A protein has these predicted regions:
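Non-catalytic substrate-recognition and accessory regions of acyl/acetyltransferase enzymes
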Residues: 1-129, 137, 144-154, 162-203
Length: 203
């Protein structure tokens, strides 16, 4: 079931102004069709020698995973112009949801399993991105969920190589190094202190 939970501001790069977008929880067939119809052709048209790192992600399978395990998974997305602008799947419990950060070892956290913005919002895929801020809005939604679950804003995730700078520099997460138990991807955490700072810095 898909439910709109908030109106959020997205920066329209073409107009140079903020516009209203919908933050939703859950997913429906229309959203899955939107991703398939709108995202996939752009991914398919990308240079084969340099495909987007997340082009192979199957959001229908992720939706099914969330529907079958509602206590462990949550899906969130952002919609504007009747198109899906970004999607995120988070994990609320299980082996991935324990901190490795020295500030609070083994403390519970929200694990961001998958986070993707629509291809037309990515500078690497288009010379004129449509919206800015989709990834940050989804990430802050995960932080809010972490607070709601009484995890003090703590977040953990493994980053694709192309997104490492975003998590390290834009969100000021702690780079915990490469995880040889997880496809050698770098593992990042947002500690309790970092979550507090990120929330305080939010415009």
């Amino acid at each position: 079931v898909k439910q709109i939970i908030a109106t959020v501001p997205l920066f329209d790069l073409g107009r140079g102004a903020f516009c209203d977008a919908s933050l939703f929880q859950g997913i429906d067939l229309d959203t899955l069709r939107s991703i398939e119809a709108d995202w996939t052709p752009i991914f398919d048209a990308a240079a084969p020698e340099n495909p987007p790192e997340d082009a192979h992600w199957e959001w229908a399978a992720k939706a099914l995973q969330a529907l079958q395990n509602p206590l462990s998974y949550e899906l969130f997305g952002i919609e504007a112009d009747a198109r899906t602008q970004g999607m995120m799947l988070v994990v609320k419990g299980g082996p991935k949801c324990f901190s490795r950060h020295p500030e609070h070892p083994r403390a519970p956290l929200i694990y961001v399993d998958f986070l993707a913005t629509a291809p037309w919002n990515r500078p690497g895929l288009t010379a004129t991105p449509t919206y800015k801020g989709v990834g940050r809005l989804l990430f802050m939604t995960a932080v809010s969920l972490s607070i709601e679950e009484e995890f003090a804003g703590r977040i953990g995730l493994h980053s694709l190589p192309g997104a490492e700078a975003f998590y390290r520099n834009r969100l000021n997460m702690t780079d915990m190094g490469k995880d040889d138990a997880y496809q050698n991807l770098r593992y990042f955490e947002l500690s309790t202190t970092q979550a507090r700072q990120l929330i305080a810095a939010r415009p």
